[in-house]
Design a protein with these regions (language model features):
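Intrinsically disordered, low-complexity regulatory segments of kinases
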Residues: 1-425
Length: 425
């Protein structure tokens, strides 16, 4: 074993990590240090991440029999003002809900909370959420492949896992994720030795830190190195924006990152589980082609342009059915349960207000035809497949990217699709 070196001390006047948050107040964040024991159970090893309202730490679970191997967890320590925050409570409730049926074959592909507790800090209690540690987000894993493209054979394996996870969310937990993106699909560790090696390296080469006003702030260490094998499983994670599909009222408020907005979200005709199916369909392009399906959805100033997004949908999928436009007209005056600020900060109560509609006239015609690309076809955007494999893939994806939510296949139905069953080179 090599000798441990002293940690690098960073300049006190150079902001790092959570200090860069606008309006940063150190009193909001619990001071956590390697070796600390949280909840008399979780011994802190290293800081592995941070966000606007939390820091994330790798910890050793000390509640195990002496003959068992080490067990590690990640502890998300939220800011003090998050204990009573509805978002933090919401995530806590949703993640508990996700344990409804651990025997379902999709359960292993959903990241669930292992424990939660409160830690007392200077400004009051801090809500702490405990999860299984994960190696890396899908976007980082993609970078390990040429041009960011997952090989079709591996993509099919991962899609089968993700669809099982979605089926579990939808059919068993009655949860709509609403925020499926590369950041929120995490990959596990290929072998426990990867974590053990990481912990050993932390002991030999501690995290750089800075000390300001008696408080240590650490530079995250979260690089676990290249995978030793690709037998690592993906999990759907981050349920902070997830919604229950069991309510009696229609769900209408805006969801999803702009790239992944489903048509019914943009048109305000209410959404349900099928919005996740659209979301995954769009995400598949990035996983397979290393680029976005909808490439021209921003203005010259970089702002999201709903008109351009709908125009690109029309170019790739054809015009929306008249029934959807009629539905949009009927729903246009229905107000959301609460006002939501748009990108300009204006409080909006309908999809038309929020997204700047209407976009179609009463005859169902798109009002911005000049924005529709004339040289864009769905078939031409698939470059990684050929022949029968490409034909089967297009049939598969078209069952996800349907204008009408009710026309999309469910996650369970998609698992039986011929493209997922066929072998890819």
């Amino acid at each position: 074993m090599s000798a441990s070196r002293s940690p690098t001390v960073l300049p006190a006047d150079a902001p790092i990590e959570e200090e860069r948050i606008p309006g940063y107040d150190p009193k909001r964040f619990l001071p956590v240090n390697p070796g600390d024991l949280l909840n008399n159970r979780y011994k802190i090893v290293a800081k592995v991440g941070w966000g606007t309202t939390s820091t994330v730490w790798l910890a050793q679970d000390t509640q195990r029999w002496w003959w068992n191997s080490n067990r590690y967890v990640t502890v998300k320590v939220t800011a003090s003002d998050c204990v009573d925050d509805e978002t933090a409570k919401h995530e806590q409730i949703i993640t508990r809900h996700l344990k409804r049926n651990p025997s379902h074959d999709g359960f292993p592909f959903v990241r669930t909370m292992l424990d939660n507790f409160e830690a007392q800090g200077q400004n009051g209690p801090h809500l702490c959420l405990v999860y299984e540690p994960m190696r890396e987000p899908l976007w980082l894993f993609q970078r390990r492949w040429e041009n960011g493209k997952l090989p079709p054979a591996l993509l099919k394996v991962y899609l089968r896992f993700l669809l099982r996870g979605l089926d579990y969310l939808h059919s068993e937990c009655h949860i709509i994720h609403t925020d499926l993106k590369l950041d929120n699909i995490l990959l596990g560790f290929e072998h426990p030795s990867v974590l053990e090696d990481f912990v050993q390296k932390q002991a030999e080469n501690p995290m750089p830190r800075k000390i300001k006003d008696g408080r240590s702030i650490y530079l995250s260490h979260n690089d676990f190195g290249p995978p030793k094998s690709f037998g690592i499983l993906p999990k759907i994670a981050d349920f902070g924006l997830a919604q229950s599909g069991e309510g009696s009222e229609p769900l209408m408020h805006p969801i999803q990152p702009p790239l992944f907005h489903a048509p019914e979200v943009l048109l305000g005709t209410s959404w349900t589980y099928s919005a996740d199916i659209w979301n995954l369909g769009v995400l598949i392009w990035n996983m397979m082609e290393g680029r976005d399906l909808f490439a021209h959805i921003r203005s010259s100033q970089g702002d999201y342009d709903v008109r351009a997004h709908l125009a690109e949908m029309i170019a790739l999928l054809g015009a929306p059915p008249k029934i959807l436009i009629d539905r949009e007209i009927r729903w246009s005056g229905v107000k959301w349960s609460h006002a939501v600020p748009n990108s300009e900060g204006k409080l909006c109560e309908t999809a038309r207000e929020y997204f700047g509609g209407p976009f179609f006239n009463s005859e169902g015609e798109f009002m911005h035809k000049d924005l529709i690309p004339t040289d864009l076809r769905l078939e031409d955007s698939v470059l990684s497949l050929e022949g029968e494999d490409k034909r089967l893939f297009l049939n598969f994806i078209k069952q996800m990217l349907q204008w009408l939510p009710e026309d999309r296949k469910t996650a369970k139905e998609l698992l039986e699709d011929p493209w997922l069953q066929a072998k890819s080179s």
